[in-house]
Amino acid sequence: MKLSPTFVFTILSLSLNFAATAVAAESCELTEADRAANANLSFDDFDQRGTTPTTSRKLGERECYAEAARASEHYLLFGPLLDQHQRTVVTWHMGQYLALNGDEETAARILAATRRQPVNADDTLDWNTYVIGTWAFLTKDRNLLRTASQKLSSAPGVGNTMNARVLQGLEACFEKPYRDAYGTTACMPAKP
């Protein structure tokens, strides 16, 4: 069976178009249309699940940290009105993206704004100590980081244990930038 040149050209063009679309989906570009689409997403779809390639979650997963921070900022301004917990989470992630992008000074100021009241009466997560510990790492206050890490290490609950390990990792790699210290295997303590 002989294929016509037109058929081959059409197939080749479609293949290249699909490849270009896949590359664009994996790029760090964040257009006005992307920001507008993000603004229509629920908190879960934007921040937790990252249902489209241009949500802050998906941009962050691709290490597009500056764009992830911009997407978060735009979402906070133009997305749905969020409750206190949701605003805190999006703001926290925006600060993390800035820190991962190397802007630890701005990140520290943003993360400082994420302290909060307990989510509910049964909330045992000592979020504020985690915030203070992370802020201490970003501002290079070793003593405050150590105090926060020790406090979380003795607090009950899985969330506190996880966050204590993160702070211990930041302590172990205190001289490194956040991008190299946060959650990396080389910095994290062994699981008990």
Label every model-predicted segment.
Residues 93, 129-138:
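"A position-specific structural signal for the A-helix of alpha-solenoid helical repeats
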